[in-house]
């Protein structure tokens, strides 16, 4: 196997961020492949074409898709049954590209052009109002670079929100500790 950087491997992955490979996203999977810790056949969205591209890059023989990770399917997108959606917002956080829009207690919708088809929104939905459909308008996977960029933005926003929450909690704790028992500073 030729020594290749993870970024070169990541460039060949479909950027669905689906985690079906067993890793937290496409880049962690690419890093595992580069380190020799993962096989090249664990990406169902990439299918045989993706496996062949990885094999060529790494100078190894292609392998059949590891079906324990799933099967290759045509690109599908999430569709929300808006009449059944209760607006719980549990599907928003798992979406790696922020393709689902909505607010708590309001119906949600999917921006089809941003959906990678990862299926990560399905399990958290308590009313099973999300289904996957082949999108005739977008039969081929969206632009990988755009999907990667949206995922990176999503991740940075989540990390920023987490950091701000922790700072707010620390500030509140300091305020409580700085007051005497009567609420005076």
Question: Model features per residue range: what roles?
Answer:
Residues 2-3, 69-73, 113-185:
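Flanking helices and flexible, charged tails adjoining ferredoxin-like Fe-S electron-transfer domains
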Residues 53, 93, 123:
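Surface-exposed charge patches
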